[in-house]
Amino acid sequence: MTIVSPDKLPSARAVELTAPLDDIYQILNEDGAVIIKNFIPLELVDKINKEVDPYLAQHAAGPNHMSEIYKLTVGSKTKHMGNLTMASKSFRDEVLNHPSMHAISEKLFRANFGDYWLNRAAVLEVDSGEKAQGLHRDDSLYPWKAFLTKDSPELMVNFFIALTEFREENGATRLVLGSHKWEDSTRYPSPEQTIPAEMQAGDAIVYLASLFHGAGQNRSQKTRRGLSITTHPAHFTPMESHIDVPRAIIENMTPLAQKMIGWRTWSTNHGVPVWTVRDGRMEDELKLKSLESPKQIQAAVI
């Protein structure tokens, strides 16, 4: 096997938000990851940061439950803060309606599965002095990983938005480009095979759940903060439930955002309605109100 020197490893490819969807999808398929520049505007970055600051100040670092796999992957100086639908109006109004996020999710999931929804959204904050996270694949959290073959469709994608600069010295996410295509399920990468996903605030790294990755060591004096949004086919149970979101908040969301958090009936790729109430569509049976004309934060990808 040929060993590639770390200084000769290719960087993650980057495109503008206005790049054609087919170009984005091609890079995602070939490399397992693609950086989209200016995924959200800096004004939105600032609003999200201000909305989550008080919650993060109260949030403890380290694993927030006793799962063994989380003990191994969440460092003692890293905060994972969920509940963003209630904590951040900007998240539920703007990010959950992001046209590029939906265009990519549609491209990945629609033909094989039908509708998709949110698996989990969380702010990940890596503090100064945090060690590098162990390399992992997000889809290894789920039992169905054992039944996948090299020809299986992708089952989850992560849209990781930089809320601060991502630099190698402050713990930028490290990627093993191409590892989503490895046929040997026992193969595990070394740190020397990783490259940092360096980004400006507002950029996003989009990567497949089958790609090896992990947060880098934060050698700087500042925290590194990002917003992770994973989507997957609605056939799968999300990691985070939104059953406790007050109806007053739900009814001030768009139909698309409502469906993303499990408050609407979804359909399979054959048009079969799922997640129904009293044999009817959830939104009809609950007489659910919604905002029908969302403010789009960017033009949809072509």
From Swiss-Prot:
Location(s) in or outside the cell = Peroxisome matrix
- Binding of Fe cation, residues: 136, 138, 213
What outcome is recorded for mutants in which this gene has been deleted?
Answer: Abolishes the production of 15-deoxyoxalicine B and accumulates decaturin C and 5-deoxyoxalicine A.
Q: What class of enzyme is it?
A: oxidoreductase
- BP-aspect Gene Ontology terms: terpenoid biosynthetic process
Q: Which domain of life is it from?
A: Eukaryota
Q: Which GO terms describe its cellular component?
A: peroxisomal matrix
Q: Which purpose does this protein serve, as stated in its record? A: Dioxygenase; part of the gene cluster that mediates the biosynthesis of 15-deoxyoxalicine B. The first step of the pathway is the synthesis of nicotinyl-CoA from nicotinic acid by the nicotinic acid-CoA ligase olcI. Nicotinyl-CoA is then a substrate of polyketide synthase olcA to produce 4-hydroxy-6-(3-pyridinyl)-2H-pyran-2-one (HPPO) which is further prenylated by the polyprenyl transferase olcH to yield geranylgeranyl-HPPO. Geranylgeranyl pyrophosphate is provided by the cluster-specific geranylgeranyl pyrophosphate synthase olcC.
The miscellaneous annotation reads: The 15-deoxyoxalicine B cluster is a rare cluster that contains its own geranylgeranyl pyrophosphate synthase (olcC), in contrast to other related clusters which rely on a FPP/GGPP synthase localized outside of the cluster.
Q: What is this protein called?
A: Dioxygenase olcK
What species is given as this protein's source? Answer: Penicillium canescens
Gene name, per UniProt, is: olcK
